[in-house]
């Protein structure tokens, strides 16, 4: 885990026989640090897969830099804003209204809730986790009971809810995530 400061996403690096995956890429302004942490963590291996739990700029701002550094990198995002990424709409992605910077990036597939994805050498479940972001997903590895919750759940609660960004009252959705 690459632990970051307050209001910046941590990054999770998972490696196994099938390759290496990174969960979330951090702010674009932290891209140099993210690349240095990855280089040390990968120990000469390639980064094969990048997953975004949601598309706030502290979780996907480094995507473009990682895609440039690792040309064969496959990127998967939650399905909710895939059309806005495909057509790169920074207003709909809330970057412009919030004054956030997120360089355009591409994606190769979506992280569909209700499916599994192999990270390291184990299958992880993809679950919808609306609340902090209505399109957020969490990743759960049932054998070890390891959860990557991003901003859906925090150590002593849940992430900040922004009803003004999406026009949604997400408090009931947070309760549903807690019930998972």
Which residues does each PLM region occupy?
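Short Gly/Pro-enriched turn/cap motifs at secondary-structure boundaries
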Residues: 2-4, 106-108, 128-130
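Residue-level detector of beta-strand structural context in well-folded domains
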Residues: 10-12, 109, 114-115, 137
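Divalent metal-coordination and catalytic microenvironments
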Residues: 14, 24, 54, 66, ...
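Short, flexible active-site-adjacent loop segments at beta-strand->alpha-helix junctions, enriched
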Residues: 18, 79-82, 88-91, 115, ...
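Active-site HxH/HxHxD metal-binding segment of metal-dependent hydrolases
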Residues: 27-32, 36-119
